[in-house]
């Protein structure tokens, strides 16, 4: 089966997003990333967060992406997820504190029943290789977003091979 995810990059205002979420549900879209711009929840009550309102009443699952970037304090991460309660979070290790920062997000998300997946953020093949290995040890069965290496014209050679919808590393590597 083919599964579609939509990345809005915060393009919609709240009212537009509410309508769009209904339309996407009718199309059986897996999820939408960051439908409205990043919100500030540090000093906000859950009932005042527009993203939390969307996540609480959405017919299409919402994944936070840009919302996670720049938050390094464990308690702030926890408050963000407890406040917004998204269906998914998307982790770009290079932008969320590396592998240790990703581990914190994963731990908090799993404790709150929030699913997650990992994507790359324009890493070269060296960075992509490390992220692929990190993702593998996490044993998350959701499709991950790890295909940016081919975008570069001047990149390092890689031993990673895409077979169907899976990334493989030959045994002799």
Positions of predicted regions on the chain:
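A polyampholytic, Gly/Pro-enriched intrinsically disordered region
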Residues: 61-62, 85-93, 164-171
């Amino acid at each position: 089966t083919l599964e579609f995810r939509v990345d809005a990059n915060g393009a919609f205002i709240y009212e537009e997003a509410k309508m769009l979420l209904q339309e996407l549900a009718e199309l059986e879209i897996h999820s939408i990333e960051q439908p409205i711009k990043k919100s500030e929840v540090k000093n906000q009550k859950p009932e005042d967060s527009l993203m939390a309102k969307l996540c609480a009443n959405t017919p299409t699952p919402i994944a936070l992406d840009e919302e996670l970037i720049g938050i390094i304090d464990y308690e702030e991460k926890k408050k963000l997820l407890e406040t917004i309660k998204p269906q998914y979070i998307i982790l770009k290790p290079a932008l969320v504190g590396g592998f240790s920062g990703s581990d914190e997000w994963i731990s908090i998300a799993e404790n709150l029943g929030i699913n997650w997946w990992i994507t790359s953020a324009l890493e070269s093949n060296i960075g992509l290789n490390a992220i692929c290995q990190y993702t593998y040890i996490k044993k998350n069965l959701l499709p991950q977003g790890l295909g940016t290496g081919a975008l570069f014209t001047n990149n390092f050679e890689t031993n990673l091979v895409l077979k169907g919808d899976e990334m493989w590393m030959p045994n002799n590597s």
